[in-house]
């Protein structure tokens, strides 16, 4: 049995690409933790420090960052779990 990947999505409620990323993950059966950086300044600072990004979405898959809704990179990192 494969262990599930640890997925964190840094997002904001008004971000359309964030909603698409979350829907994409959900439709494929992946669970994730959603962090609303508009309400969590520390998380916003942490993601900026780790990735250099101030925009969302940023997805961490087992601590490997994916910036934006990059399907190819998301699929590549999740391939071993499908």
Give names to the regions the model predicted.
Residues 30-44:
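Thiol-based oxidoreductase modules, predominantly thioredoxin-like and allied folds used
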Residues 57-67:
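A short, hydrophobic beta-strand/beta-hairpin element that forms part of a small beta-sheet core
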Residues 49-52:
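Major-groove DNA-recognition helix of helix-turn-helix-type DNA-binding domains
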């Amino acid at each position: 049995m494969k262990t599930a990947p640890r997925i964190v999505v840094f997002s904001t409620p008004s971000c359309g690409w964030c909603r698409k990323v979350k829907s994409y993950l959900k439709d494929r059966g992946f669970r994730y933790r959603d962090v609303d950086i508009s309400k969590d300044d520390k998380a916003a600072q942490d993601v900026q420090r780790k990735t250099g990004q101030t925009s969302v979405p940023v997805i961490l898959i087992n601590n490997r960052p994916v910036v934006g809704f990059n399907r190819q990179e998301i699929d590549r990192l999740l391939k071993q779990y499908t």
